[in-house]
Every structure is written in C-alpha cells, then in structure tokens.
Amino acid sequence: WMDDEDVMGVQERMLHHIWSEVAANDQTLIDVVNEYRVSQGQDPVTVEIPNVPFPRIPYCDAIEIVKAGGGEIEWGNDIESHHCDIIAAQYPGFHFIPRWPMSMKPFYIHHKEEEKGTSGGQLSRGFDLN
C-alpha cells in the first residue's frame, strides 16, 4: 500500500524522467519554440532537469513563509497564486505543499489522527505540487 510520501516520490521521479527525456531527445523542438519566442520578443527557454527529491514545505510552514514575505493569509485559508509566488521566491522549481487542513479537503482524503496544525486543526495527507 502506498501513502502520500510514496505518491509524491512517484510524481517527482516521473517529472524528472520527462524533463530528462525532453532535454536529451527534443532539442530540435526546443529550438523551434525558442525561434518563435525570440520572434515575439521573448527570452528563449531552457530545459532544466529538476533535482529529486523535491522540497516538501508543510502547509503550516508555507503559511509562515507567505506571512514573512508580506502576504496576507491565515491558517485554514487556501494558498492562492500570488501566495505561491512568495513561496517560489524561497523555493524555486518544483516543490510539494503537504499536510493541508483536513477541513479544506474532500471526504476521500485520509489523515493521521496524531497530526495537528499550529491552530490545533486536523491535518490531511493531501498535498499540492507547485
């Protein structure tokens, strides 16, 4: 049986494999994309193979990062795209945000009874990949 940590491992290895294959085998397509981007006044893209494992930033820590970065958010709020920008400034590249409040997740997401958030709320085994 797999738990949330195992699923995150599968996802990060899959993304690492995809990016590795693109970097190794698709330079012609990357060149076509970059030719178009340059013609539109945009910078060319590069394929950067992500390192594994991806950082895990528990929801409670992510909330503190957002607050420290000047964002307005409270425990139990959703992490919105502008909050993700604050987190990404500290953790560029792929990263997981696990252990969201159980109250935010659907009924089929599991939890561990002993895991509580900073406010005492039950934490889920759910996660987001950013």
What is each PLM-predicted segment?
Residues 1-17, 30-130:
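A translation/RNA-centric and nucleic-acid-associated enzymatic feature enriched
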Residues 25-29:
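Residue-level recognition of alpha-helix termini/interfacial anchor residues
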